[in-house]
């Protein structure tokens, strides 16, 4: 390492110890970082970490797999860098913390890409082949992006849900939950996307505003006598009229099969210009105003009295196909917040409607379900056959108007379900699907899936803690899980069903294992090409292959099975210590993983869940193409450096939204420069220091050096406690304060005189360097999890014989006697120094002095402050950075203060102190006595600073 002195003339005559370092002031991050990424890979740094960590307690952060489609975005960067910080910090804390990245490879988005590129008519085998190739290409692209961010992991062998072994193990997991009795087939309304042509998981649904027609419709009386009796009347005053419903989905009217009233809500029979109308009593005034009618309440009755009354379908007069009646059922979900207090039920298109109708005895075959998977009505539907339901909306309104049953229609903007992929509206649609029953008791007995999952939530640590209630509520209130999808590129539900009854083949579990063995060799294509006779012989006449695929959330939700205990079981273990994802994953990966592990293992697959927020711009707005406020991590890395992204993420409280803007990045960059400058100072001043040769024993250090090490050790204890809780922003904040104030603003500031002017091999200077050595050891290691490039760059200068900083553990600082007392004492001294600095500033502003070294100060102090100051003796001037300092004892705080006077002496050319002995040696008229001693004699003696 260079030991070059600065070349100005005075220093050539009277040299000071100004050393150089190959660690540059400018990071030049965009240029240097890719070189580090390449070097880490070539030197096998990740493998070296694994070798160094072997035998330690395991810590498993299980990677939630990003989808193998598209470039990485800022959300990916946040997620992967947070994971990287956790893994590196756990390795350095003495754990064996491997990181196996993964990718989610099956599902709709990739199918859509293949359809876009090659059309919709490809044979299934070709779709799969092209989907595999596409996913592989996308993975390589994303992998390069993650590596560029400084993320270390097993990039050579990541897990992929499309790897044959993972596909096979997923089929085995399906077999296990079938064996336990959780899986059943049933007709139920599920989230259905017409563009996907498939059911959607809850996590695949998003809500956006949509404007639809809202209508109030009258269902005419079908049983006037019974209706009169229900209201306590001998007869209805007039024949015309009926019960009124309000809906925002006119397209569901053709499939109406019932009406729902709340048993305790009071309903009114109102005489109006349009006949007798039944609405909730508390909605009468609002309804009359909306219908532009005047009305008189004839009678009232609670909903329970109206049960089983029947009313004609509102389109009965428009077409014979609608000549049916709708019975009144009771439902607690009916409210009077809006509408009429009466809900029309189309059981095929609403979960509550479906449950109500099934509860009242309706069978699956009774349910009218005229909407096909592509969103069009069946051709045979009267009046609207073949129409898209969205196109049919206005036509249904017109038909109701013509039939005389429409009371009101207007446009209504409401939050409505949309497909997260296609951004198009979706519906609830009753289809025959395979479900995992939330309230099913497993065959071996015990608790239901819901109960087990809720216990799993209770047993999990949440970071931040509010995540617990969120996940608990979602599990407590969710419906049964729709496991099946109607797609090609997915893991098959590879069993055989009876062609007539739909029952599973009696040898299903055995057959699933046979299929899994084939998939393990050839992938899911083995199921597609399988001739049923190969496995079930003549039973193929009675049974057919199930064509459904598994929900992709089952793919990723079973990674604890097919990765932790499957493809990567040699490195990983179950349960994982931590799952770490964005807050949307409470209804996504956290959720599906909890359900599958509850079914397979009766417990959660994780010990802890860490949730981070989403990225927003500087004004708190979500990032979107329309606003043009997106931030590309590649662009930032290439312009400012990935280190700046890492520092931004680490310094932000990820439990909320993470705001980013040019102004924020500018502040982060300034903070980075301060840290880098601190490291440069440390490395430069250690460049002629060999610990084995020059280290001074701790009990021989100067007092301020012992304080600095004790303070740094105490700080490290605080930092590691934050790392332990995955709270990184306090780590960054404290380290930035440490670099700028504790070191730069105090200790290093005081140290400069000793480092630069003491004899190179003096105890005073070597004491300072020994302390700096320990500080550098500690600082680089606590920086390494987030400032990975910079810490490694500095480490290679500091410890060139070491492979990498990432095989190190956190530093064990030497024990300093009376550390707490030292910290207290020097905290007090720093307070006094702050007061003195302020007085010096005032003197400088008044032009009484130039630099602080031109000053001589007298500090009037009492009590502990006096004792602390006096204990430093002549070294006090070095702490205050003045040429002379005197302390005078006073009786109380009221008498305390600082006197500043300009020195009457000459300035030493070498140390810049103003001293009486400048020129005491005739041959050196510009040199002070201590510099003469440091250069030509035994050197000055210091004890404190």
From Swiss-Prot:
- What ranges does the record list as Basic and acidic residues composition bias? 1-10
What residue spans carry the region label Disordered?
A: 1-21
**Which HAMAP family does this entry report, sorted A to Z?**
Ile_tRNA_synth_type1
Record note on domains = IleRS has two distinct active sites: one for aminoacylation and one for editing. The misactivated valine is translocated from the active site to the editing site, which sterically excludes the correctly activated isoleucine. The single editing site contains two valyl binding pockets, one specific for each substrate (Val-AMP or Val-tRNA(Ile)).
Give the residues the record marks as binding L-isoleucyl-5'-AMP: 581
Kindly list the cofactors needed.
Zn(2+)
- Major site of localization recorded for this protein: cytoplasm
Concerning Pfam families, the annotation shows: Anticodon_1, tRNA-synt_1, zf-FPG_IleRS
Stated name of the protein = Isoleucine--tRNA ligase
Q: What is its EC number?
A: 6.1.1.5
Keywords from UniProt, A to Z, are: Aminoacyl-tRNA synthetase, ATP-binding, Cytoplasm, Ligase, Metal-binding, Nucleotide-binding, Protein biosynthesis, Zinc
User: Gene encoding this polypeptide?
Assistant: ileS
| Statement: the UniProt record of this protein carries the keyword Nucleotide-binding | yes
Q: How is the cofactor bound?
A: Binds 1 zinc ion per subunit.
Reactions listed under catalytic activity: tRNA(Ile) + L-isoleucine + ATP = L-isoleucyl-tRNA(Ile) + AMP + diphosphate
Describe, as the record does, how this protein assembles with itself and its partners: Monomer.
* Renumbered ranges of motif 'KMSKS' region: 622-626
Q: Which GO terms describe its biological process?
A: isoleucyl-tRNA aminoacylation
Family indicated by similarity? Belongs to the class-I aminoacyl-tRNA synthetase family. IleS type 1 subfamily.
* Motif 'HIGH' region boundaries: 66-76
Q: Which PANTHER family match?
A: ISOLEUCINE--TRNA LIGASE, MITOCHONDRIAL (PTHR42765:SF1), SOLEUCYL-TRNA SYNTHETASE (PTHR42765)
Q: Where in the cell is it found?
A: Cytoplasm
Which InterPro entries has this protein been placed in?
aa-tRNA-synth_I_CS, aa-tRNA-synth_Ia, Anticodon_Ile_BEm, Ile-tRNA-ligase, Ile-tRNA-ligase_type1, Ile-tRNA_ligase, M/V/L/I-tRNA-synth_anticd-bd, Rossmann-like_a/b/a_fold
Amino-acid positions noted as binding ATP in the UniProt annotation, renumbered to this chain: 625
Q: Could you tell me what this protein does?
A: Catalyzes the attachment of isoleucine to tRNA(Ile). As IleRS can inadvertently accommodate and process structurally similar amino acids such as valine, to avoid such errors it has two additional distinct tRNA(Ile)-dependent editing activities. One activity is designated as 'pretransfer' editing and involves the hydrolysis of activated Val-AMP. The other activity is designated 'posttransfer' editing and involves deacylation of mischarged Val-tRNA(Ile).
**A GO cellular component annotation in the UniProt record:** cytosol
Q: Which domain of life is it from?
A: Bacteria
């Amino acid at each position: 390492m260079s030991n070059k002195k600065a070349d100005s003339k005075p220093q050539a005559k009277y040299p000071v110890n100004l050393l150089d370092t190959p660690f540059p002031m400018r990071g030049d991050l965009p240029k240097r970082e890719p070189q580090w990424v390449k070097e880490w890979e070539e030197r096998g740094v990740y493998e070296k970490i694994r070798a160094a960590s072997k035998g330690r307690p395991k810590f498993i952060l299980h990677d939630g797999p990003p989808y193998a489609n598209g470039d990485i975005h800022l959300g990916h960067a946040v997620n992967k860098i947070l994971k990287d910080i956790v893994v590196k910090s756990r390795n350095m804390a003495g754990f064996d913390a491997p990181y196996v990245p993964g990718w989610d490879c099956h599902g709709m988005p990739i199918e859509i890409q293949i359809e876009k590129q090659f059309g919709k008519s490809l044979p299934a085998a070709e779709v799969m082949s092209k989907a595999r190739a596409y996913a592989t290409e996308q993975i390589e692209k994303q992998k390069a992006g993650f590596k560029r961010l400084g993320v270390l992991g097993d990039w050579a062998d990541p897990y992929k849900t499309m790897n044959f072994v993972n596909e096979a193990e997923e089929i085995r997991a399906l077999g296990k939950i079938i064996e336990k009795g959780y899986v059943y087939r049933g007709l139920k309304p599920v989230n259905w996307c017409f563009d996907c042509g498939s059911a959607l998981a809850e996590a695949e649904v998003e809500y956006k505003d949509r404007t639809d027609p809202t209508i109030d419709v009258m269902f005419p009386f079908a049983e006037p006598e019974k209706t009169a009796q229900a209201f306590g009347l001998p007869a209805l005053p007039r024949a015309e009229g009926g019960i009124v419903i309000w809906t925002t989905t006119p397209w569901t009217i053709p499939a109406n099969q019932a009406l729902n009233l709340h048993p305790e809500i009071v309903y009114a029979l109102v005489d109006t210009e349009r006949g007798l109308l039944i609405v909730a009593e508390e909605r009468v005034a609002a309804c009359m105003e909306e219908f532009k009618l005047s009305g008189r309440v004839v009678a009232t009755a609670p909903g329970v009295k109206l049960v089983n009354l029947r009313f004609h379908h509102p389109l009965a007069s428009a077409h014979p196909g609608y000549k049916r009646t709708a019975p009144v059922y009771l439902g607690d979900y009916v409210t009077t917040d809006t509408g009429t207090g009466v809900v029309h039920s189309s059981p095929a298109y609403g979960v509550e409607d479906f449950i109500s109708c099934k509860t009242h005895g309706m069978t699956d075959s009774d349910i009218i379900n005229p909407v096909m998977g592509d969103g069009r009505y069946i051709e045979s539907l009267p009046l609207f056959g073949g129409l898209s339901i969205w196109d049919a909306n206005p036509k249904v309104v017109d038909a109701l108007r013509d039939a005389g049953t429409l009371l009101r229609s207007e446009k209504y903007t409401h939050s409505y379900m949309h497909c997260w992929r296609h951004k198009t509206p979706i519906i609830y649609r009753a289809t025959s699907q395979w479900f995992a029953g939330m309230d099913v008791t497993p065959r071996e007995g015990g608790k239901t899936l819901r109960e087990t999952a809720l216990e799993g939530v209770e047993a999990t640590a949440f970071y931040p803690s509010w995540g617990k209630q969120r996940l608990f509520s979602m599990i407590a209130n969710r419906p049964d899980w729709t496991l099946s999808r109607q797609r090609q590129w997915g893991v098959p539900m590879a069993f055989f069903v009876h062609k007539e009854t739909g029952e599973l083949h009696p040898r299903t579990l055995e057959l699933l294992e046979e299929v899994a063995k084939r998939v393990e060799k050839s992938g899911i294509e083995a199921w597609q090409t399988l001739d049923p006779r190969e496995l079930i012989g003549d039973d193929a006449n009675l049974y057919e292959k199930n064509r459904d695929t598994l929900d992709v959330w089952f793919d990723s939700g079973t990674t604890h099975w097919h990765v932790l205990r499957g493809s990567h079981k040699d490195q990983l273990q179950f349960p994982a210590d931590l799952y770490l994802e964005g807050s949307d994953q409470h209804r996504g990966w956290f959720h599906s993983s909890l359900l599958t592990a509850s079914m397979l293992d009766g417990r959660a697959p994780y010990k802890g869940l860490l949730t981070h927020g989403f990225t927003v711009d500087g004004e708190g707005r979500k990032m979107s193409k329309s606003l043009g406020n997106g931030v590309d991590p590649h662009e930032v890395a290439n312009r400012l450096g990935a280190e700046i992204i890492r520092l931004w993420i680490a310094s932000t409280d990820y439990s909320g939204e993470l705001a980013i803007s040019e102004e924020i990045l500018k502040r982060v960059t300034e903070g980075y420069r301060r840290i880098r400058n601190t490291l440069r100072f440390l490395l430069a001043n250690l460049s002629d220091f060999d610990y084995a040769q020059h280290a001074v024993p701790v009990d021989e250090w100067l007092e301020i050096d012992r304080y600095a090490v004790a303070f740094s050790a105490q700080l490290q204890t605080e930092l590691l406690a934050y790392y332990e809780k995955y709270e990184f922003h306090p780590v960054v904040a404290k380290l930035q304060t440490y670099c700028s104030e504790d070191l730069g603003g105090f200790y290093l500031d005081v140290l400069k005189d000793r480092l630069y002017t003491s004899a190179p091999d003096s105890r005073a200077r070597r004491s300072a360097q020994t302390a700096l050595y320990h500080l550098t050891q500690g600082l680089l290691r606590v920086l390494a999890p987030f400032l990975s490039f910079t810490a490694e760059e500095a480490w290679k200068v500091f410890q060139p014989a070491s492979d990498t900083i990432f095989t190190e553990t956190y530093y064990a600082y030497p024990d300093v006697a009376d550390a707490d007392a030292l910290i207290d004492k020097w905290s007090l001294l720093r307070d006094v120094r702050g007061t003195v600095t302020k007085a010096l500033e005032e003197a400088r502003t008044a032009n009484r002095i130039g630099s602080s070294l031109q000053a001589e100060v007298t500090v009037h102090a009492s009590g502990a402050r006096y004792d602390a100051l006096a204990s430093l003796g002549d070294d006090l001037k070095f702490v205050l950075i003045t040429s002379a300092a005197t302390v005078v004892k006073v009786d109380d705080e009221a008498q305390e203060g600082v006197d500043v006077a300009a020195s009457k002496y000459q300035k030493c050319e070498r140390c810049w102190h103003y001293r009486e002995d400048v020129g005491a040696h005739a041959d050196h008229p510009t040199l002070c006595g201590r510099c003469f001693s440091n250069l030509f004699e035994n050197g000055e003696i210091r004890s404190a600073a």
